[in-house]
Amino acid sequence: MLRFSANLSMLFTEYDFLERFDKAALSGFRGVEFMFPYDNDIEVLKRKLRDNNLEHTLHNLPAGDWAAGERGIACIPGREEEFRDGVAAAIRYARALGNKKINCLVGKTPSGFSATEIHDTLVENLRYAANMLAKEDILLLIEPINHFDMPGF
């Protein structure tokens, strides 16, 4: 049986983020996902989920400076500590919200590094995230985005 989740980062955008939970429930969704919960109080998110009888199905690891065009930092050499801090934050939110899936946007290919450095950084960061999430029984997802929709990804 198919199960659909409303992506509250993409749907109902004419409403304030917290109002989108109500709109998703009224539209018949039983699950919701959102890209980045980190600017929201965990207790407020828990209440919105509970009040609307919604399951939180997925959120992303922090992805760097989104406004500046970053789309993940997992592949960027020198940002490993920031990536690890993001894994910890993602776990904290997932635990509190009952989520068992976390998505990693690996990032755009950075300039100034060799392909080997970028590859090795990505592999090490994904390995770290997978191991930390596995300890919490959380599945790490990797979103395959193409170069047409997101150049440089």
Feature-to-residue mapping (PLM):
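Active-site acidic/histidine proton-transfer and metal-coordination neighborhood
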Residues: I73-F153
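N-terminal pre-domain/capping segments
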Residues: M1-R95, N99, R127
